[in-house]
């Protein structure tokens, strides 16, 4: 599976990239929300397939766009079945629960997490996409 990863912490980027690649996924890393959105939508004809099967997004990001802003823009353009989203964040549990009520189609994982939890969530999201 091709995974777009939006994470600003280089150590977490590398950890996730290495772990996911060991499990057969290709990972494309982005540090800023605008970079992920450009990869998804910039100057592409409608018939060109999306570059990722799924995206993993951190909520707390540097730059103009927060993770929530990125999610809003993606969901405005694409339905959940076209691009599953997994949020991995250190936000407080109640914040994640609030976001879950706004975005019921998105999977939320609180940091720190076990790799197995992420892998299972990835597989479940992939199954829902099919």
Model-predicted regions and their roles:
Residues 7:
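Conserved acidic carboxylate
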Residues 10-35, 103-106:
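Two-component/phosphorelay signaling modules centered on CheY-like receiver
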Residues 29-54, 59:
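Acidic, metal-coordinating helix/loop segments flanking the phosphotransfer/catalytic sites
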Residues 50-53, 78-84:
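His-Asp phosphorelay/catalytic-motif detector in bacterial-type signaling
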Residues 66-81:
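Short amphipathic alpha-helix used as the core "switch/output" element in two-component signaling
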Residues 87-89:
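Hydrophobic/aromatic residues positioned on beta-strands within the core alpha/beta folds
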Residues 109-110:
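Residues at the ends of beta-strands that form strand-to-helix hinge/output surfaces
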Residues 113-123:
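C-terminal output helix
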């Amino acid at each position: 599976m091709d995974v777009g990863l939006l994470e600003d912490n280089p150590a977490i980027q590398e950890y996730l990239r290495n772990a996911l690649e060991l499990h057969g996924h290709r990972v494309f890393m982005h540090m800023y929300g605008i970079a992920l959105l450009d990869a998804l939508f910039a100057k592409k004809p409608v018939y060109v397939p999306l570059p990722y099967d799924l995206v993993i997004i951190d909520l707390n990001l540097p730059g103009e766009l927060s993770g929530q802003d990125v999610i809003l823009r993606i969901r405005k353009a694409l339905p959940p079945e076209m691009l599953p989203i997994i949020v991995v964040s250190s936000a407080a549990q109640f914040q994640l629960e609030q976001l879950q009520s706004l975005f019921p189609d998105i999977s939320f994982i609180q940091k720190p997490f076990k790799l197995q939890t992420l892998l299972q969530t990835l597989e479940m999201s992939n199954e829902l996409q099919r």
